[in-house]
């Protein structure tokens, strides 16, 4: 019996006080397990159960849990399955920076960078409407809705409206259907019933070059990009951005995602090489040159730095 049902029975006088205490205690014990995880996880401070939702508080940000998803950002941070890259990212961001968070999801990276760089200008882009509302909700929760400019849109090699495939776990939304059926399952919120879902929706997209021109962006220092395989198309729409503004880029590149778009991640490396960039992985807070991805590659996140513009950063963090 669920705790809420038990509560209703007690309120209706159908369960005695002592039986209610006993059964309620059994259902509240998992809170102690959550407390133990928080104690072990140095990044997490507490979990707050509120009237308007459940909130994870970290050292610097707050995120709503979304248990309608079978996995959510707050959850992965709490249980410690997601590494914390924001601190290292921050070292490549100068004072007064302009930052693009492409594929912002519910705002974990945007919020982390906003707290670390209070004098920055941050643009957060999320094309899926439901996820975008989660982004706005978390920005308001942290009081960062003015600092972080949220845009309901994505980027591609062309402008227009494109079809996105959105599984039940909408963080895996993509311009090509995913093949991992784990993300199809809806969050059961403890109800014990999981259904598969994959929807097709239309979302607005633009090119990097067009957006920068239309919004008169004169400076761009850092781009974080996570678009579930569309990274090559995102970057190919920013030729002038990478030739002229030359931001540091931190991006996900996975062979399995790229394959759904009929390209190999090495094509991204070649493209950036043509713009004067080098590709790097990171280890022990150092940049490691990375030339070519093959079947033995285990890294999934990569930095691109321009050889001339970012010479000082390369000297400081190069291996």
Regions found by a protein language model. Give the residues of each.
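Conserved acidic-Pro-Pro-aromatic motif
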Residues: 52-53, 117-124, 207-319
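S-adenosyl-L-methionine
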Residues: 1-128, 133-206, 215-217, ...
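Short, glycine/acidic-enriched loop or turn micro-motifs at the edges of active sites
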Residues: 69, 104-106, 129, 155-157, ...
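Hydrophobic packing residues within well-ordered alpha-helices of enzyme cores
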Residues: 113, 135, 164, 234-238
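Short phosphate-engaging motifs
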Residues: 131, 171, 230-234
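Short internal loop-to-helix segment that lines adenine-nucleotide cofactor pockets
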Residues: 77-98, 178-245, 257-260
């Amino acid at each position: 019996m669920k705790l809420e049902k038990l509560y209703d029975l007690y309120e209706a006088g159908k369960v005695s006080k002592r039986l209610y205490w006993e059964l309620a205690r059994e259902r509240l014990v998992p809170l102690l397990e959550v407390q133990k995880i928080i104690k072990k996880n140095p990044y997490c401070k507490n979990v707050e159960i509120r009237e308007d939702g459940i909130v994870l508080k970290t050292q610097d940000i707050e995120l709503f849990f979304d248990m309608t998803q079978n996995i959510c950002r707050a959850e992965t941070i709490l249980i410690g399955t997601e590494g914390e890259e924001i601190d290292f990212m921050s070292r490549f961001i100068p004072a007064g920076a302009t930052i693009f968070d492409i594929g912002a999801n519910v705002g974990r990276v945007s919020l982390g960078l906003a707290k670390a760089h209070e004098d920055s200008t941050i643009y957060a882009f999320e094309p899926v409407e439901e996820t975008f509302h989660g982004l706005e909700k978390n920005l308001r929760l942290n009081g960062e809705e003015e600092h972080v400019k949220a845009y309901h849109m994505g980027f591609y090699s062309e402008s227009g409206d494109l079809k996105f495939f959105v599984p039940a776990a909408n963080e895996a939304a993509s311009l090509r259907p995913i093949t991992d059926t784990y993300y199809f399952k809806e969050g059961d919120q403890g109800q014990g019933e999981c259904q598969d879902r994959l929807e097709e929706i239309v979302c607005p997209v633009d090119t990097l070059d067009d957006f920068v021109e239309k919004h008169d962006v004169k400076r761009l220092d850092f781009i974080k990009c996570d678009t579930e395989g569309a990274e090559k198309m995102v970057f190919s729409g920013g030729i002038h951005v990478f030739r002229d503004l030359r931001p540091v880029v931190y991006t996900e590149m996975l062979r399995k995602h790229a394959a759904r778009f009929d390209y190999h991640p090495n094509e991204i490396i070649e493209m950036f090489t043509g713009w004067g960039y080098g590709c790097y992985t990171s280890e022990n807070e150092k940049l490691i040159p990375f030339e070519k991805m093959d079947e033995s590659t285990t890294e999934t996140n990569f930095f691109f730095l321009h050889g001339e513009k970012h010479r000082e950063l390369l000297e400081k963090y190069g291996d």
